[in-house]
């Protein structure tokens, strides 16, 4: 299995290099499938400098900011690594997300316009005549877009801020787990129930459905997420654990 691809967007003019590099790297890390690869997820300063067309100084400054946020780990004489979480940490993050997103859903029932809510249906329009499992990659992207939209429709900037760093891991775990246990079809059904509750402006029901939906992911990780501890262990213990992963330890 090839390592996750790092796709970095070009810089804009008018902002400091450090801040631009920070934003571009953070977005690139969000888009990586960091739990779908048994090896370390390593970043290379020289490669980043070439991709962004800047010196290594703003790269290092941006990486320091990302390290302070707990997104990367800088190891002297070894390199820069994207931080992956243990099974327990992921479950705790999902529970925190469930609390924040369920509140966002209640607020969306009060604050979102009818047009806003209709855009949630648009996200899944292409699945009206095909099952989500028929195009799992497209559905995975739609699933992630849906959850980001719910937070946005709350009109609560603080919720967007609080969920920002959680989203890096939530996105990767959702993308990985959606392929398992018929979760795509179940997810589609639950999304529709949430949208209908929003249309009825039933904030209490929408909040409960959103919370139960996300806690279902926590239960799934509890059952199938032991590999997360192996991935984390591989980062610490090195080649022996990595070899065990490559020899067939099942990913979720």
Task: Give residue spans per PLM region.
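Short linear motifs at protein or domain termini
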Residues: 1-106, 110, 226-252
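C-terminal all-alpha effector/ligand-binding and dimerization domain
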Residues: 2, 168, 172-252
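A short secondary-structure junction motif
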Residues: 28, 32, 36, 127, ...
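Alpha-helix N-cap/N′ positions at the starts of helices
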Residues: 43, 100, 122, 186-189
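Juxtamembrane/interface motifs at transmembrane-helix termini
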Residues: 60, 111-114, 138-141, 159-161, ...
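Conserved amphipathic alpha-helical segments that form helical-bundle/coiled-coil interaction surfaces
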Residues: 93, 111-175, 188-197, 205-216
